[in-house]
Amino acid sequence: MITFPCAKINLGLNIVSKRKDGYHNLETVFYPIPLTDALEIKLMGDEFPSDVPCDLKITGNAVDCDEQNNLVVKAYNLLAADFRIPRIHAHLVKRIPSQAGLGGGSADAAFMIRLLDERFRLNIGNAEMEKYAAKLGADCAYFISADPEDGDTACYAEGIGEELMPVSGPGDNLRGYHLVVVKRDDIAVSTKEAYAAITPQAPAKCCRDIVRQPIETWKEELVNDFEAPIFKMHPELAEIKQKLYKLGAVYAAMSGSGSAIFGIFKHKPANVEEQFEGMFCKIMKL
C-alpha cells in the first residue's frame, strides 16, 4: 500500500509569546501543497527478514538521519506500542526538500500513521491520530487531515502548532493560482538561533483573518516573523523573495523557519527555473 505525504506552506507565522516550558506560542495558517514524498509499506515476509519491526529504506533526496531515527519509524513504533501491528518493510522516496520549513518529515510521520490505520484497520479516528501525531512533532497533527488537492484542508494553528482549527478563505482565494517554491541547498537555517533573535509579540491582525482577504492585500499585512532575523543571517534568501516579486508574484514569503521561499502567481510564470538555476525550484498549480 502506498501514500503520498504532502508538503505545506505557512501563510503568515507570528510568534506571540514565550511559554514557561521554553517553547513559543505561535499563530499560523498551514496550507497543503501538491509537492509530495512517496511512502509504501509491505508486510515483512520470511524471504526478506529484518532485525527491526519496521525496516525502512529511504531513497531520493538525502535525509540527515539514519533510518531507525526517522519519524516514519518513530510513528510505527508509537502505534505498535498500543496496537498489534505486523512487522513491515517501508520505502520512503524523498522529494520534499529537508530543513526547508515545508513540513516534509512531519508529513511522512503523519501519513505513516494514516497508512497503518488504513492498512491494518485500526479504526483510530482522526482525532486520536492527531494526538499520536502531535507526540512526534508540533506540526505533525496537521498532516492527519491535509489533502494537497483540497485547499479547504488548510488549518489555523495556535499553541506550538498542535492546536488546529479549520480556516475558510485561503482555499477559495488560491484556487487556480500557481505556486513556485525555491530552496537553496547550501543554506541551513538554525531554528534555535532564529527564535533567539525574535521578540514575541501579538500581531496587529491575526493571520487567520488576513488570509480571508483578497490575496492582493497579503503583501502588506501577512508576515512571517522569522524572515527578519533569518534574512539578516542569510541575505540570499531575501534576494530570492524579491526576485519572485519581480517575476510577478502577488505574494511571496518564507515558509516556516526556512529556508524555502515561495511565491504565489496569478498566471504560470515563464522560464522561472532559469532564474533559480542550481536551486530546488518547483512550480505547481493550486
Give the role of each language-model region:
Residues 47-65, 112, 134, 214-223:
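Short, basic/glycine-rich phosphate-binding loops at helix/coil junctions
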Residues 2-5, 12-14, 18-25, 122-250, ...:
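ATP-dependent small-molecule kinase catalytic core of the GHMP/sugar-kinase superfamily
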Residues 1-100, 117-127, 154, 172:
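ATP-binding N-lobe of GHMP and related small-molecule kinases
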Residues 53, 177-179, 258:
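Short, solvent-exposed beta-strand edge segments and adjacent coil->beta transition regions
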